[in-house]
């Protein structure tokens, strides 16, 4: 196949447990995304859950990353087959599925990205992902080149981490530290020992099933600790956070 998307290098890197350093994109801006794509990150999350993103804003961001070595990962707003199908059709191959609590929910996410008989993805013969029908073996290659990362961020998800990690087709486990902290009774305090112990437990159980773990860690000390604990893919910051910090610093330099 003469298509740079296949094979999926990010999926292969996760399977090989190669450390992948990423960044979170929440500004919903093609220009910002293009700048991130030039920075040298291994992967970038384009957030469709908490950021103001939808199909119309994500397509220009995918275009902005064309030619970048950074793998685009979309966090969908919910584990819903129609939403996932639309993200597939516009050209995403790497998915972060929020708030997965059971093996059944994990399996549903996988099925949503696979064509029958392996899954339930609807079939369109011409869309952006298959270069509008010009990729002859897209149907044969697509199923095995999709990355599914499921996000554990509740007590029920923690309780079911073994079953979730063992789900066929799940490529990785991602910890949502803020929601996990809230679920454990420590809203706004992901550094609480209970939360940190739970994160370490999730990492250990995922590793026991041979699945790589990831997390968002905008504080350097946290990111380095999670890497020491065995995290494979870590988002070490965000465009929003970097922009706010740098502009605040600039203003403070001259205003104070």
From Swiss-Prot:
GO biological process: D-glucarate catabolic process; galactarate catabolic process
Active site per UniProt: 50
Pfam family, one: HpcH_HpaI
Site (Transition state stabilizer): 75
Record keywords, A-Z: Lyase, Magnesium, Metal-binding
One Gene Ontology term, aspect cellular component: cytoplasm
Note describing how the cofactor binds: Binds 1 Mg(2+) ion per subunit.
Keyword Magnesium: yes
Protein's name according to its UniProt entry: 5-keto-4-deoxy-D-glucarate aldolase
Organism: Salmonella paratyphi A (strain ATCC 9150 / SARB42)
């Amino acid at each position: 196949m003469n298509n740079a998307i296949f094979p999926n290098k990010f999926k292969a890197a996760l399977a090989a447990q190669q450390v992948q350093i990423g960044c979170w994109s929440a500004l919903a801006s093609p220009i910002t995304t293009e700048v991130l794509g030039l920075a040298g990150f291994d992967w970038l999350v384009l957030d469709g859950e908490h950021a103001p993103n939808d199909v119309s804003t994500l397509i220009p961001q995918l275009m902005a990353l064309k030619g970048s070595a950074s793998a685009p990962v979309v966090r969908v707003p919910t584990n819903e087959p129609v939403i996932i199908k639309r993200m597939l059709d516009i050209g995403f191959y790497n998915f972060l599925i929020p708030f997965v609590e059971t093996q059944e929910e994990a399996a549903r996410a996988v099925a949503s990205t696979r064509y029958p008989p392996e899954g339930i993805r609807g079939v369109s013969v011409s869309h952006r992902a298959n270069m509008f029908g010009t990729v002859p073996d897209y149907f044969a290659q697509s199923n095995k080149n999709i990355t599914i990362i499921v996000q554990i961020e509740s007590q029920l998800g923690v309780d079911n981490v073994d079953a979730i990690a063992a789900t066929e087709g799940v490529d990785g486990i991602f910890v949502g530290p803020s929601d996990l902290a809230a679920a454990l009774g420590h809203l706004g305090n992901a550094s609480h020992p209970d939360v940190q112990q739970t994160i370490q437990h999730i990492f250990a159980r995922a590793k026991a099933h041979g699945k790589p773990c990831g997390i968002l860690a905008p504080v350097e000390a946290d990111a380095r600790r999670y890497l020491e604990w065995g995290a494979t893919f870590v988002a070490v910051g965000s465009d929003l956070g970097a922009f706010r910090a740098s502009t605040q610093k600039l203003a403070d330099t001259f205003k104070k």
